[in-house]
Amino acid sequence: MATATFDLTGGVPEDREFVVAEKPDDGLRDAVNVWIEEENGLFAMRIGVEAVGNAWDRHEFWLDVAFADGRVLSKRGDGETHSPYGEDGRATVRGTGPVRFECIEPFRRWLVSYKGQAAETSTQQLIEDPDFAETRWTDLDIAVEMDMAAPPWVPGSLLPEAAEALGGEQGSFMSPRYEQLFRCSGTLCVDGEVRRFKANGLRIRRTGFRAFAGFWGHCWQSAVFPDGRAFGLNIYPPREDGGPNYAEGWIIDRDGLRVPARPVQVPWLRRFVTGGEDVSLVLETIDGRRVAIAGTTFVNVRSCGGFAKPVDWPEDFPLVQQSHAFYTWDGQRTTGMIERSSKPSVMEV
């Protein structure tokens, strides 16, 4: 549990929290995005802004709000870039069009808001047609205050073999980044109807160059529990050439300390369903403990389109699904995230 004296930096320099303020080299990406899961599994959302050097005046953004009954409100696009500077003159704001992120206190408190329209769709429609025609629109107003609940995790920092894997081509799929679990409260207003909520979430800060050529899939899961325990993992599937694949995880136990772990059982993506999917996992810590965490999704969202694929895009490039799940660890339940991707050739599609 985070307190006023609890170190939430994880050793990451404070200036990593500040956004890139001036136009960088073409291709460099500076992104802030969050996953948010309502504490009772009634709905969940993903919101993000991606600032790209060669389109600096109009940052990209994405939004999905998914309800447990299968309703989805979705928007992809770009917008007029907000000033990166907060009231104190520091580069604490990443915003564009209807989306705004603001760092209030590094590694402790962030705000996110969305005010605009979103297209009506459903989890089933996205399975059948991820590039669906946007014909029905809904007014949407979101405001969330996020309080960080654990120190950030920098992928590649916990296991030597993970650092080695990310030091090569596999690191280009992810780009330099860290992620931090949080708890939050906020309001969700859909067509004038206001709903107040409490939730759990994961915040990602990513700055650097990113490439996807050669990417072959992944499984990424994380959550924080009411008693302060938490876990996270990210793993790429075993390689066809038998070479080492990136695989890294961790737990935070009741003592508040992060213990590195290796994923030994994960729920690879094999088919698209709308929810109710078993996404249980097993981690093996470096001190020899086997940690089993049960998981069941309460809503699954196949990743939307929103960008023009290059003409040389591989036919077997991985398909992506973002989902939100109930996780249970030694009898205690919470809500958290899971994102997976797999090549169509290994899926039931």
Predicted regions and their residues:
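Structured soluble/peripheral alpha/beta segments that form catalytic or ligand/cofactor-binding pockets
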Residues: 1-349
